[in-house]
């Protein structure tokens, strides 16, 4: 899988993404249902993620997890646990959680998918993707994430926060700020596919 690793900045200690999701996008017009149509060219990880999330092609999990392990993990220190980012869309099977478990299996590292608790957005508020700037996103996310004390033993752990898409970084920042309040997490690194 061809990747172009990029460092990402935020409230985490280290952060990287594998590649851009979409390399190019050409507007084709409006279809018969009134939807805008695009001819998208995705990166290899971007196409794998698209197939996983929108075509339910679960065979993409192993190659994506293997690519994260091979390319991104050597850039981080020792990882003690993996925390998938909370999903923004409810699905019967959450792609980021499944990816975290596939990566955890490859690394022999525990996954804590219930550690981050996301409060629902206030009724009538716009979706995060419809907000226009980082300040609006930060305001919409303020106070929405709390920590479930899921680590049952003593100690301090280095966590890898895993997400599929990285845009402005507002959500990952809000989650990392919440993680900083949890005494059992020493530091948090961030990884995303795109």
Model-derived features with residue positions:
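A short, structured active-site edge motif that brings together acidic residues
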Residues: 83-86, 111-125
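Active-site-facing substrate-recognition patch
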Residues: 1-78, 89, 120-151, 155
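Glycine-rich phosphate-binding loops at beta-strand->alpha-helix junctions
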Residues: 86-95
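Glycine-rich phosphate-binding loop and adjoining helix at the ATP-binding site
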Residues: 96-112
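Acidic, divalent-metal-coordinating active-site segment for phosphoryl/phosphodiester hydrolysis
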Residues: 165-175
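Short, well-ordered alpha-helices that flank and scaffold nucleotide-derived cofactor binding pockets
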Residues: 70, 101, 105, 177-181
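Long C-terminal interaction/binding lobes of large macromolecular proteins
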Residues: 142-150, 157-161, 174-182, 189-190
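PRPP-dependent phosphoribosyltransferase catalytic core
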Residues: 1-16, 173-194
């Amino acid at each position: 899988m061809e990747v172009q690793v990029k460092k990402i900045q935020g409230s985490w200690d280290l952060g990287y993404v594998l590649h851009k999701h979409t390399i190019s996008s050409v507007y084709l017009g409006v279809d018969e249902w009134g939807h805008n149509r695009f001819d998208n060219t995705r990166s290899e990880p971007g196409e794998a993620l698209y197939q996983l999330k929108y075509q339910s092609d679960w065979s993409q999990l192993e190659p994506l997890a293997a690519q994260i392990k091979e390319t991104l993990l050597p850039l981080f220190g020792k990882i003690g646990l993996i925390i998938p980012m909370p999903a923004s869309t409810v699905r019967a099977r959450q792609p980021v959680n499944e990816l975290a478990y596939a990566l955890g299996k490859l690394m022999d590292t525990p996954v804590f998918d219930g550690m981050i608790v996301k409060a629902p957005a206030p009724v009538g508020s716009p979706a995060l993707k419809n907000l226009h700037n980082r300040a609006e996103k930060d305001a919409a996310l303020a106070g929405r994430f709390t920590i479930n004390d899921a680590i049952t033993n003593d100690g301090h752990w280095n966590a890898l926060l895993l997400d599929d898409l990285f845009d402005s970084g507002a959500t990952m920042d809000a989650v990392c700020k919440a993680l900083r309040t949890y005494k059992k997490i020493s530091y948090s690194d961030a990884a995303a596919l795109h």
